[in-house]
Amino acid sequence: MATTESFAQTLAAKQPRLLAAFKHIIAQNHLAHAYLFAGMEGAGQPELAHWIAQRLFCLHINDGEPDGTCEECVRIANGSHPDIVTVAPEGQRIHVDQVRYLKAEFSKSAVEGNRKLFIINDAEKMTASAANSLLKFI
């Protein structure tokens, strides 16, 4: 997993306007309950999702940026934060069992803080039954 600096650097290079928009959205406390990031592979969608996670959980925000060195940022970068739930395709698809896992996690309280964040990588690879299951609870 990448570091906070590389998340921000990647986003600044690939999606500078989007990064600026999300900095503003978060600073104004206008973050919606869900976002769908679509685009060509390599456009920075996973980096943006992880940057948002670090920005929301970071213990030491500096000029609107996560510091990348606090325990929260490091665990997010390593994929080990208990309040960040990530689902990705198993093989070529995201299956209904993975969405059931998300639903079960969604119903639980945050482990360490007052919020949880869910990231679905490559959501377009959901089976039809997985997508229908997801739509029933979001």
Protein language model features and the residues they cover:
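Clamp-loader machinery-focused feature within the broader ASCE/P-loop NTPase space
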Residues: 2-136
